[in-house]
Amino acid sequence: MRTMSKLLTIFFCLAFLAQTGVVLADKNPEELAKESESACEASAKTKPTIEMIKEKVDKACELLTKEGKAAFPKFKGKDSEFIFAGTYIWIHDLNGVMLMHPIKHKLDGQNVTGMKDTAGKFLFVEMNKVCKEKGAGWVDYMWPKPGEKEPSRKVSYVKLAKTPDGEMVAGCGVYDLPTAEVDKLLGK
């Protein structure tokens, strides 16, 4: 009887997970990006902390290390734990290809090494440099807040993950930190 109970529990868990995957698969990238952006904006009432950012990036890297690209759907949509406190996790590789951006899905598959912020900083080149040299670290640049067009100062924590699909960089950023705090993170 215990075996039957365990089998039924496993069956229902697998059925739930399969259904969750089907729900995500049914949404087109545009719908999922809008849902992700709405979730990000809705969660902005809570301000992210430096510790919160690092914790989420570390958790993202653990997930990527285990599952590789198969984990990407877990980073998108209104129920993603990786969309939080007005921010989100994105993933790119060391060649500068955006692998997964939950809000700007049109960047997925694009080489972003040529992207510069308004100050002329090649932000993804800088992020990859930090990851290659240190494994993880902070980078500051100008980037629009979710739902806005104009860029604001953002500082992001990026970390290298060795996954079944190769090396990937997971990143997450925060806006509106005091300049002194940003300078401290950057080692200035």
Question: Language-model features: where?
Answer:
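N-terminal membrane-sensor/transducer module of prokaryotic signaling receptors
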Residues: 2-9, 20-188
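RNase H-like DDE/DDD metal-dependent nuclease/strand-transfer catalytic core used by mobile genetic elements
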Residues: 12
